[in-house]
């Protein structure tokens, strides 16, 4: 047995005894108390659509954990692969305000990452690593530190799979090998390609560690238990069954949950922050919505978490009071409060943080949001109500401390999986 341990960001990880596949199921709202319509996986199991996941609920590890707040894609994927909160790795949203350069930018550049990843540290210690994402926006961040040129790592997205090259991605011809056309970015097939490619690489490369990250296009459009949602999880179940048959350890979690954010008639429940601040007499401020990314058809840049920059320190109390008693506002925190509670980097967060309740989302101003792409009642995420996520492993785990987080998935699976369990 290999007793080698790898230390990453002050956490120790055992060398995998068999290949480990960690899957981040984007937007996978879980079941249990406070869930939206019973949870995606649970409803699919109850409908008889996912026999493999049903077997894990019966005889393996089937539980829950908390994700990072803001409950968005980038901060949580990077927390999962670094094992630490955003206060340490620096990625606190999909989008942020660069105060040094006075510019609002997508948080996709590898230079923004402040901590090494578990993937890179294992790769540099001799492990073969494969990373497959649905959206290309995550690829460069997740691939930081991987030895692509040395041939021991692969990192590509299904979105741009036809552009994958040996020199930049560690693989070529993957579209032909998978046998699927490059999917549309707004499709279930974008995630299916991730799983299909994962099976192909597990057969040909057999990496020691594989990280698969899907897209939440389906979850934004379809509630748990609906036919389309159940079909999506049935597809995923089939690929997980094939991976399990290859003798790998499979660990599933999510970057965030997903809740309905609309009124009974279907119109979105939006609180626009700029008009409220204006009504309070404020003029010098900047509202940042960290959910912002290029894929506005998913959510219209409307999420449950916003941060506000104020030009004048004297405006703090008045700005905070602007949201008093507003229906749909769950909490308003100062920068220090938010960083202490949620583990966020203080230099990348505004003076105030606003979080909405489970039924509402936050916007900047009506004219700044193009909602024409929202063909279905809005479902979104970002706040405390989407913090609970699945934590599922096809092995039994030793008893672990309470307060489990999604970014504990590597630690718990590598360090606490019971040998021979399945």
What are these regions (language model features)?
Residues 21-22, 52, 231-277, 354:
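Metal-dependent active-site segment of extracytoplasmic phospho-/sulfohydrolases and closely related
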Residues 81-223, 229, 298, 304, ...:
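His/Asp/Glu-rich, glycine-adjacent segments
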């Amino acid at each position: 047995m290999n007793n080698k341990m790898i230390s990453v960001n002050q956490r120790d990880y055992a060398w995998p005894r068999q290949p480990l596949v960690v899957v981040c199921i984007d937007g996978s709202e879980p079941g249990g108390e406070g869930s939206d319509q019973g949870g995606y996986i649970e409803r699919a199991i109850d409908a008889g659509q996912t026999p493999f996941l049903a077997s894990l609920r019966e005889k393996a590890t089937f539980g829950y954990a908390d994700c990072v707040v803001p409950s968005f894609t980038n901060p949580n994927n990077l927390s999962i692969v670094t094992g630490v909160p955003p206060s340490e790795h620096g990625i606190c949203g999909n989008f942020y305000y660069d105060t040094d350069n006075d510019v609002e930018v997508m948080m996709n550049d590898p230079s923004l990452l402040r901590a090494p990843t578990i993937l890179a540290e294992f790769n540099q210690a001799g492990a073969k690593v494969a990373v497959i994402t649905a959206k290309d926006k995550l690829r460069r961040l997740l691939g930081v530190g991987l030895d692509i040129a040395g041939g021991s790592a692969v990192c590509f997205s299904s979105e741009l799979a036809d552009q994958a090259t040996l020199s930049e991605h560690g693989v070529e011809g993957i579209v032909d090998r998978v046998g699927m056309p490059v999917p549309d970015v707004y499709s279930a097939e974008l995630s299916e390609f991730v799983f299909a490619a994962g099976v192909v690489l597990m057969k040909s490369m057999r990496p020691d560690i594989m990280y698969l990250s899907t897209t939440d296009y389906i979850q934004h459009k379809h509630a748990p238990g609906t036919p389309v949602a159940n079909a999506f999880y049935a597809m995923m179940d089939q690929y997980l069954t094939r991976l399990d048959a290859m003798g790998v350890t499979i660990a599933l979690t999510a970057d965030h949950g997903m809740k309905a954010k609309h009124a009974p008639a279907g119109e979105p429940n939006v609180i626009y922050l700029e008009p409220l601040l204006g009504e309070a007499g404020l003029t010098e401020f900047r509202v940042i919505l960290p959910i912002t990314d290029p894929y506005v058809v998913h959510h219209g840049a409307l999420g449950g978490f916003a941060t506000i920059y104020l030009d004048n320190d004297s405006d703090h109390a008045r700005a905070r009071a602007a949201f008093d008693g507003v229906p749909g506002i769950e909490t308003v925190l100062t920068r220090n409060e938010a960083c202490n509670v949620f583990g966020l980097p203080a230099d990348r967060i505004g003076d105030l943080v606003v979080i909405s309740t489970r039924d509402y989302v936050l916007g900047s101003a009506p004219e700044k949001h193009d909602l024409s792409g929202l063909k279905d009642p809005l479902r979104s995420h970002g706040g405390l109500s989407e913090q609970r996520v699945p934590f599922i492993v096809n092995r039994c785990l030793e008893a672990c401390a309470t307060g489990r987080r999604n970014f504990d998935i590597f630690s718990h699976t590598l360090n606490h999986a019971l040998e021979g369990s399945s």
